[in-house]
Regions:
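Acidic, metal-coordinating helix/loop segments flanking the phosphotransfer/catalytic sites
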Residues: 35-55, 119
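The feature encodes the CheY-like receiver
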Residues: 63, 81, 93
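Active-site residues of response regulator receiver
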Residues: 58-59, 89
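C-terminal output helix
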Residues: 113-124
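Two-component/phosphorelay signaling modules centered on CheY-like receiver
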Residues: 14-39
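Hydrophobic residue at a beta-alpha junction
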Residues: 37, 62-65, 74
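Conserved acidic carboxylate
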Residues: 11
Length: 134
């Protein structure tokens, strides 16, 4: 049996959290997920986590601390630098895409509105997480 993926999901919309969890299950992805819904709680979690996540999936539009600020802090930490990051957000602005690319994210995905879109999103997340294991 394959080891479950350790995922950190930084997302403030409970409906999107549930959709992502359902899509992971529908695609038979074995995972353990920590969900953080407020940006200001991310570094408390990461600094006290016994096991770092294999992949971070995050929104850019978060309460209390902006997702871009979180992304910059993650990429500034040597212990977190190698963790792949998938940005999953409603934003599709060229500025956001450019910023995230410069921060070294693995994938930028605009939140889908269809089941097929969510299945494609799951495929992307699993591919990024799998490649980090190799």
């Amino acid at each position: 049996m394959e080891k479950p993926f350790d995922i950190l999901l930084i997302e403030d919309d409970i409906d999107d959290v549930d959709l992502l969890k359902d899509a992971l299950l529908d695609n038979n992805v074995s995972y353990q997920m920590e969900v953080i819904m407020e940006g200001d709680k991310v570094f408390n979690y990461l600094s006290s986590a016994e096991i770092l996540p294999e992949i971070i999936v995050m929104d850019l539009n978060l309460p209390k601390t902006d997702g871009k600020e979180i992304l910059q802090e993650i990429r500034s930490s040597s212990s977190l630098l190698e963790i792949p990051i998938v940005v999953l957000t409603t934003s599709s602005s060229p500025e956001d895409i450019d910023y995230c690319t410069k921060m070294g994210i693995s994938k930028f995905i605009t939140k889908p509105a269809t089941i097929d879109g969510w299945n494609s999103t799951i495929d992307s997340i699993v591919n990024v997480a799998s490649s980090s294991r190799n």
